[in-house]
């Protein structure tokens, strides 16, 4: 079984990280991979994951929000072992070195310092791609400003509570869990490839509740359902919006093989049950007006999001150039030897 998700998000507030909860459970051991641009961090982790898949093991992939084709982390549940990119913007450090975590330094295979010309090039490219990220975050902030139209207005708090009660009732019907634990992640990303949704976690669930969200009630309802699930003893994976890093987008209950998902086109899934939250509001005239306001606000936000993604594409192109500056300085033969040695150690 292979699943993937994001632990970093490009948002209106800048980069948000959830890496502090990665591979931090009881018995887990985290290898923090260090190294500069182009030093092979993603390739190193991908080689480990390929061997795990070859051996029939479950693998969790943490995708990079800046470049979704690249890996920022890998976790092997059967071994309670993980690896993550510990460099900025998601810097990671050991909890207790040698006890629950350590370093893997791939920078040792990079012959530094750079030449004078490459030093100037690296400085210029670093400044340029960081400026692009700042521009992208400003556009995402503009997108977020439309959220005021999504907050309950005509409908009010009563409708949000009613929607929450409906989801809590569904949680109560599920078998109770035995060890409540909350994990947070992003089930998508605002990225150089556009606004992505990674549905691999939902696809593993036997039952998916799709919360139809024309009136923007699902976020509050999912928060209530999360509290109810924890109270029932469930392990809970709370998936936050990659656009703002705060709003709940989905709730996954692994023990019950169930998920509650907001505003995603899942009609092709075999086990989807639709929850029309808008119909709980009673006054359909107010509902229709609210839907129109929400659609207009989402269209406006989508324009800013699209511009933000285009700017992130420009940032990635600059970062690719930066990686190319470092590549000639890398001893990839030595890196390959380390990778092979590490794979032997892990799976021996």
Locations of the language-model features?
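N-terminal pre-Walker A segment at the start of P-loop NTPase domains
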Residues: 1-22, 160-200, 347
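Conserved nucleotide-sensing/catalytic segment adjacent to the nucleotide-binding pocket
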Residues: 1-14, 23, 50-114, 121, ...
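Structural beta-strand/beta-sheet cores of well-ordered domains, especially the beta-sheet scaffolds
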Residues: 29, 43, 102, 206-207, ...
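Glycine-rich phosphate-binding P-loop
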Residues: 30-49, 193-197, 202-229
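A cross-family "folded-core" feature that marks the main globular domain of proteins
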Residues: 33-34, 44, 60-63, 96, ...
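An accessory alpha-helical subdomain
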Residues: 121-175, 293-339
């Amino acid at each position: 079984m292979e699943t993937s998700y994001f632990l970093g998000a490009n948002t209106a507030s800048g980069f948000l990280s959830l890496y502090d909860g990665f591979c931090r459970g009881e018995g887990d051991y985290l290898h923090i991979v260090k190294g500069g641009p182009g030093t092979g961090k993603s390739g190193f982790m991908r080689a480990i994951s390929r061997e795990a898949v070859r051996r029939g093991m479950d693998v969790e992939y943490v995708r990079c929000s800046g470049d979704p084709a690249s890996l920022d982390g890998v976790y092997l549940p059967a071994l309670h072992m993980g690896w993550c990119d510990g460099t900025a913007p998601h810097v990671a450090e050991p909890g207790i070195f040698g006890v629950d975590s350590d370093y893997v330094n791939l920078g040792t295979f990079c012959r530094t310092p750079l030449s004078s010309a490459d030093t100037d090039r690296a400085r210029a490219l670093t400044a340029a791609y960081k400026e692009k990220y700042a521009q992208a975050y400003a556009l995402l902030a503009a997108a977020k400003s439309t959220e005021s139209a999504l907050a309950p207005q005509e409908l009010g708090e009563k409708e949000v509570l009613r929607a929450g009660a409906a989801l809590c009732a569904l949680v109560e019907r599920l078998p109770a869990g035995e060890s409540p634990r909350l994990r947070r992640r992003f089930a998508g990303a605002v990225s150089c490839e556009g606004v992505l949704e990674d549905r691999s976690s939902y696809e593993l669930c036997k039952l998916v509740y799709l919360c139809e969200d024309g009136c923007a009630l699902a976020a509050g309802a999912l928060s209530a359902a999360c509290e109810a699930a924890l109270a029932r003893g469930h392990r809970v994976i709370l998936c936050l919006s990659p656009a703002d890093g705060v709003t709940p987008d989905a709730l996954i209950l692994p023990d019950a093989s169930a998920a509650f998902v907001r505003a995603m086109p899942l009609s092709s899934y075999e086990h989807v049950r639709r929850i029309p939250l808008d119909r709980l509001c009673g006054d359909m005239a107010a509902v229709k007006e609210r839907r129109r306001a929400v659609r207009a606000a989402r269209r406006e936000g989508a324009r800013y999001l699209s511009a933000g993604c285009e700017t992130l594409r420009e940032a990635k192109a600059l970062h690719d150039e930066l990686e190319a500056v470092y590549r000639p300085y890398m001893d990839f033969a030595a890196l390959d030897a380390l990778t092979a040695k590490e794979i032997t150690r892990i799976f021996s």
